[in-house]
Amino acid sequence: MKAWKKTIVILFAKAYNDAKEYVFVLYLEGKRMDTLDELYFTMLKNAADGKVELAPEGADPKIVECFVLPDDGTVVRVKPCLCPPDERHCEDACEWDALKPGGEVGIAVDPKKCVGCQACIDACEMESLKTKKDIIPVVQELHQYDGPVYALVAPAIAGQFGADVTLGKMRATLKALGFTGMLEVAAFADILTLKEALEFDKNIRSENDFQLTSCCCPMWIAMIKKLYHQLLPNVPGSVSPMIAGGRTVKALHPQAKTVFIGPCLAKKAEKNEPDIEGAIDYVLTYQELRDLLTVTNLNPAEMPEDSQPHASTTGISYAYAGGVAAAVKRTLEKLNPDRKIKLATRRADGVPGCKEMINDILAGNRDGNFFEGMGCIGGCVGGPRAIIPKEEGKKQVQAYADAAEFETPMENPYVIGMLKALGFNTVEEFLTKSHLYDRQF
């Protein structure tokens, strides 16, 4: 933060302290701390060491709550907003009407409207808005919870912690941190790929019919629900792969805690949506996991291999823009190769691009019948909490997808085995008789 900004914050801190609002001047062992990062890493290290008291004496309790108390919000205000009412760039940047005037403290975030896109955080010049972190409560669960705690990793994880860090090494790393096991969310994307292919085969009967995807992107789904709700009948009734994974784990292990790990902030908001809450207990970003590895001195590259491949090429491909549409198309071609009306895709990534595509659909300018939207440029590999550039991320994911033993979920024995554990003999039987992965929009 620039020096003049820091000075302003300190000048205003005492006035707001009387109102029990956020104070930015922190103290650690008698020494003043001028950044939230110092407090965050101190608390994270204490949690990793198994200490009960995490925050140093003198730390503002409201700021401590940002790190240790999960709530129903993704964006939190860590100090008062000092911007004039007509110069609040965060409010202008929000597409979802989630930021409103907040009395003496300037701005308030409505967690029910916020989708976690981070636009307001990027626009806030005073650094008053931050994203909620779940890593400290997760570490506490790993130390204190008696039941199993499973990590569910998004397919964009390939290459995020180093080009030589395989999924097997990441599994060993997560187990060393205390997780019971690691599951690839791409395996659940496999099942949803077949679900969407079957939905397309059932519902697209004429040249005027069309389907909107992707269920995996909460920003895309939120855009349709909040801004273009007239198109909801064209959205397949499916949960995201993250929610599908959480529901499956809890169906097989009711006492389990589920922790999703990915590059996306919007997933923190998605897990709390009323119709799907409970499937995922915590959402971590890759950067939060990296922070934990830093304070525990664990290097994934030095860990042994614990390889248990779960996913097929199509499921892994969900991580980059165009991957979902390609996955459904390849699966549909195997499912019904003689289909007369072929799947014709159009995709968009980034909020402006998605809006342009939707407006074309509403105007009748449809040049496809299967439309994929991703809120981030490049798809999940371009998520705001990815560690490596999206171009490198896509390259790493494609290499991992190409190396997969199975091309589609129809040949994937892990998927079949998982469904048999749920009481179904085939994917088709599961999708027609179970509502575990259904969602009503």
Predicted regions and their residues:
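N-terminal [4Fe-4S]-dependent radical SAM core
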Residues: 58-100
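Short, intrinsically disordered, charge-biased short linear motifs at domain edges
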Residues: 69, 78-82, 99-103, 110-111, ...
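Short acidic, glycine/Ser/Thr-rich loop/turn "cap" segments at secondary-structure junctions
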Residues: 77-78, 107-109, 156, 232-233
